[in-house]
């Protein structure tokens, strides 16, 4: 039996990447994917809502990612068509966002 090779640093002698780096890269990919399918103003409004609610915290980032994943899943289930959701022709794109309960 041979032993498993020991892990060594990359050839350029940079330190190995942290597991969190992969999470950040995956998150950026999801945001880029959301930008392909949703109006950027809608995503900015969502980001502002999450920021107002959670501030600049990891919990807020997780909440934003969770909402984006759900929205993309529903969007793809409904049949994508690569249109930008929330961007009605000639109207305010933010009017497509339902008013939250308790804010009426």
UniProtKB/Swiss-Prot annotation:
Subunit-structure text: Interacts with human UNG.
Name of encoding gene: vpr
Single GO BP term: symbiont-mediated arrest of host cell cycle during G2/M transition
Major subcellular site: virion
Keywords for this protein: Activator, AIDS, Cell cycle, Host G2/M cell cycle arrest by virus, Host nucleus, Host-virus interaction, Modulation of host cell cycle by virus, Phosphoprotein, Transcription, Transcription regulation, Viral penetration into host nucleus, Virion, Virus entry into host cell
The organism's taxonomic lineage, starting at the top: Viruses, Riboviria, Pararnavirae, Artverviricota, Revtraviricetes
Name of protein: Protein Vpr
Any single Gene Ontology cellular-component annotation: host cell nucleus
Phosphoserine modification, residue list: 83
Region (Disordered): 1-21, 84-104
Phosphoprotein among keywords: yes
General function of this protein: Stimulates gene expression driven by the HIV-2 LTR. Prevents infected cells from undergoing mitosis and proliferating, by inducing arrest or delay in the G2 phase of the cell cycle. Cell cycle arrest creates a favorable environment for maximizing viral expression and production.
Stretches with biased composition (Basic and acidic residues): 10-20
InterPro entries per the UniProt record, alphabetical: RetroV_VpR/X
């Amino acid at each position: 039996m041979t032993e498993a090779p020991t892990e060594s640093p990359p050839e350029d002698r940079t330190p190995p990447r942290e597991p969190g780096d992969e999470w950040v890269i995956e998150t950026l990919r999801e945001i880029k994917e959301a930008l392909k399918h949703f109006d950027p103003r809608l995503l900015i409004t969502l980001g502002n809502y999450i920021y107002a609610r959670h501030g600049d915290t990891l919990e807020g980032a997780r909440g934003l990612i969770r909402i984006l994943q759900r929205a993309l899943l529903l969007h793809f289930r409904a049949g994508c068509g690569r249109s930008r959701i929330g961007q009605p022709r000639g109207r305010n794109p933010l009017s497509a966002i339902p008013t939250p309960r308790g804010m009426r």
